[in-house]
Amino acid sequence: MKIGVYGASGRIGKLLLEELKGGYKGLVLSSVFVRQKCEIDFSSFSHKPLVTNDLKAFVRACECVIDFSLPKGVDSLLDTLLECPKILVSGTTGLEEKTLEKMQNLALKTPLLHAHNMSIGIAILNQLAFLASLKLKDADIEIVETHHNLKKDAPSGTALSLYQTCAKARGYDEKNALTTHREGLRSKESIGVAALRGGDVAGKHTIGFYLEGEYIELSHTATNRSIFAKGALEVALWLKDKAAKKYEINEIFD
């Protein structure tokens, strides 16, 4: 399957290119979208991709777009994909509601998956979080996430996704149960989400379930960002030949 990388100059974009250098389980890098002059050397790649700032040409040259860009860039990508539907794997976080609506419209035409975290371990953590939230009905739930000091969004999209999982399991109102800043006593039907920023931490997420006399913590730590690139490529393989729909990363394990 031909892969197009959107956001190639970013941290994960560069790792995607590295994974695709010699091909990845039958996936071939066919196109790379760049807004400015590309300084990437593709001479060692098994297949030389189309490198372009023409969004339509970029999309036409591939069968699946993998997006790790910025929120403002996803809108124009979706507009092009709505005209020329291709499989989409998107790991861009911080998207506005109007952008998510466009994504839902695209899902009527092609299979796509948008996840705040492409790590397989985080997908499993989500499932464990749902089970623990359901079974430990009296436990207070608190989520803590830690990332490098250059991360722009806080809390992280992954932490918010874990929050949504826990809130759904408990039947909480997702809009009102979230607490990112606390003063005074803790509200019973609330879930705290705290964000720590420092150094070069790739990502750590911990969910605590606090009971009287004991507590359980579920934690995931990313020690290498390559897991996000490999996870996105595995998602692309999984989406191949799937029906048009917006899929969730947890469905990979169903």
Curated annotation (Swiss-Prot):
<feature type="binding site">
    <location>
        <begin position="157"/>
        <end position="158"/>
    </location>
    <ligand>
        <name>(S)-2,3,4,5-tetrahydrodipicolinate</name>
    </ligand>
</feature>
<keyword id="KW-0520">NAD</keyword>
<dbReference type="GO" id="GO:0005829">
    <property type="term" value="C:cytosol"/>
</dbReference>
<dbReference type="InterPro" id="IPR022663">
    <property type="entry name" value="DapB_C"/>
</dbReference>
<dbReference type="GO" id="GO:0009089">
    <property type="term" value="P:lysine biosynthetic process via diaminopimelate"/>
</dbReference>
<dbReference type="GO" id="GO:0051287">
    <property type="term" value="F:NAD binding"/>
</dbReference>
<keyword id="KW-0560">Oxidoreductase</keyword>
<keyword id="KW-0457">Lysine biosynthesis</keyword>
<feature type="binding site">
    <location>
        <begin position="91"/>
        <end position="93"/>
    </location>
    <ligand>
        <name>NAD(+)</name>
    </ligand>
</feature>
<comment type="function">
    <text>Catalyzes the conversion of 4-hydroxy-tetrahydrodipicolinate (HTPA) to tetrahydrodipicolinate.</text>
</comment>
<feature type="active site" description="Proton donor/acceptor">
    <location>
        <position position="147"/>
    </location>
</feature>
<keyword id="KW-0521">NADP</keyword>
<dbReference type="InterPro" id="IPR000846">
    <property type="entry name" value="DapB_N"/>
</dbReference>
<dbReference type="GO" id="GO:0050661">
    <property type="term" value="F:NADP binding"/>
</dbReference>
<dbReference type="GO" id="GO:0019877">
    <property type="term" value="P:diaminopimelate biosynthetic process"/>
</dbReference>
<feature type="binding site">
    <location>
        <position position="148"/>
    </location>
    <ligand>
        <name>(S)-2,3,4,5-tetrahydrodipicolinate</name>
    </ligand>
</feature>
<feature type="binding site">
    <location>
        <begin position="115"/>
        <end position="118"/>
    </location>
    <ligand>
        <name>NAD(+)</name>
    </ligand>
</feature>
<keyword id="KW-0220">Diaminopimelate biosynthesis</keyword>
<dbReference type="GO" id="GO:0016726">
    <property type="term" value="F:oxidoreductase activity, acting on CH or CH2 groups, NAD or NADP as acceptor"/>
</dbReference>
<feature type="binding site">
    <location>
        <begin position="7"/>
        <end position="12"/>
    </location>
    <ligand>
        <name>NAD(+)</name>
    </ligand>
</feature>
<dbReference type="Pfam" id="PF05173">
    <property type="entry name" value="DapB_C"/>
</dbReference>
<dbReference type="InterPro" id="IPR023940">
    <property type="entry name" value="DHDPR_bac"/>
</dbReference>
<dbReference type="Pfam" id="PF01113">
    <property type="entry name" value="DapB_N"/>
</dbReference>
<dbReference type="GO" id="GO:0008839">
    <property type="term" value="F:4-hydroxy-tetrahydrodipicolinate reductase"/>
</dbReference>
<dbReference type="InterPro" id="IPR036291">
    <property type="entry name" value="NAD(P)-bd_dom_sf"/>
</dbReference>
<keyword id="KW-0963">Cytoplasm</keyword>
<dbReference type="InterPro" id="IPR022664">
    <property type="entry name" value="DapB_N_CS"/>
</dbReference>
<feature type="active site" description="Proton donor">
    <location>
        <position position="151"/>
    </location>
</feature>
<feature type="binding site">
    <location>
        <position position="35"/>
    </location>
    <ligand>
        <name>NADP(+)</name>
    </ligand>
</feature>
<keyword id="KW-0028">Amino-acid biosynthesis</keyword>
<comment type="pathway">
    <text>Amino-acid biosynthesis; L-lysine biosynthesis via DAP pathway; (S)-tetrahydrodipicolinate from L-aspartate: step 4/4.</text>
</comment>
<protein>
    <recommendedName>
        <fullName>4-hydroxy-tetrahydrodipicolinate reductase</fullName>
        <ecNumber>1.17.1.8</ecNumber>
    </recommendedName>
</protein>
<comment type="similarity">
    <text>Belongs to the DapB family.</text>
</comment>
